[in-house]
Structures are given as structure tokens and as C-alpha cells.
Amino acid sequence: TLDGKGGFWLASEGNTAKMVPHGLLHVNAKGEIKEQIGLPPELAANEVRFGFEGVAKVGDMLWMAVQREWRDDPKGMVKLVAYNTETGEWGAVHYPLEPKGAGWMGLSEITVAGDHAYVIERDNQIGAAAVVKKIFRVKLADLAPAKLGGDLPVVAKEEVRDLIPDLKATGGYVVDKVEGFAIDAAGEGFVVTDNDGVDDSSGETLFFSIGKVE
């Protein structure tokens, strides 16, 4: 996400087993890393491999979507984590996932436009087994982060679009990883999928418009 000063904030999904930390990276316009911010102890103590899947900026606050439940989350709840770039304070809210069927349910993106934060929520299934590939939104006014280590408020979500009809439109199978969403200055929404390489799939990647996001 843009930092408002010509650079970018990036979310790094780590893997402790491979000695790759979760965290935030602040880079300049050339992509040079100028600052690295690791997780605070309250988050690090409960992390799992499925970490930050997107970052969005609202004023001085960065919001990150955590893909799946961490060890301190109630079942069916994932964190939207907040980091204040001016004060260095961390916080979070809980986001309620859709009921889980086969596989797992999680978040794959967060982006901000107007008065809302938009997230992609999906299962990890393909083809006929895929049930949830959706865009939801949360009111920015409801994103009031609580202190880590205690009870977190649960935000209300509103469904914006079911993406499965879009994913079926090409006549192929429904792909798994819907992982990117952006809204341009005219209000048009764009979605992109991640093929994770081509070793065990067709390698198909989709990039498409969902039209005006009202």
C-alpha cells in the first residue's frame, strides 16, 4: 500500500520454521527496504505460518489481514491487526469467518476505499468443491483496535460480491487462490488470482473487473 510519501508499506507473511519472520516492510520508490518492523510479543507468541495477507493504510494506521486463526483466536475468528506508524502501537479486532466446510476458511486481501475496508474471504478448495470466494467489507468507523492480549471487538461484515460466477465465466474450473483486490479512482473493482507456480496446476491466472463497487 502507498505510504503517502512516494514509498510503500508491504506485509511479509513469514514462516518461523524457515526463519522468515512475519512483519512489515517500509520501502522507497526503488523498492529498497528502509525499515523492518517485527511482530510485538503478544502476536509473536501465538503466530502460525498463515500470516499477513494484505496491508492497507488509513491515516497513520496500517491494517493487516491475518489469513487464518492464530493460537489465541476463537474458532472461526481471525484478526485484522492495526499498527500506528506514528506511535508504534499495535492493536486488533476480530473478523468473523464464514462457516467452514471442506478444507479451511481464511482471508486473502485487505484494501481500503471510501468509508470501508474490503477483504477477500475464501476457502482453499477448487472446482466443484469451492464454496466461498467472496468480497466482504467492514465500515472503517467500526475498525477500533483494542489492545493485544485481551478481548478483541468483533466487527460486522457486509457481503459485496460472490466471485464464484466470475471464476466460472471462462469455462474452466474454479481456481483456489483469489488473492488480490483493488478499486481504482473511478470506483471500478479489479480481482486477481495467484497460481502459486505451475508444478501442480494448470498455471491459469485470472485478472478481471467486477465493475463499479457501490
Which residue ranges define each predicted feature?
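Sequence/structural signature of beta-propeller domains
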Residues: 1-214
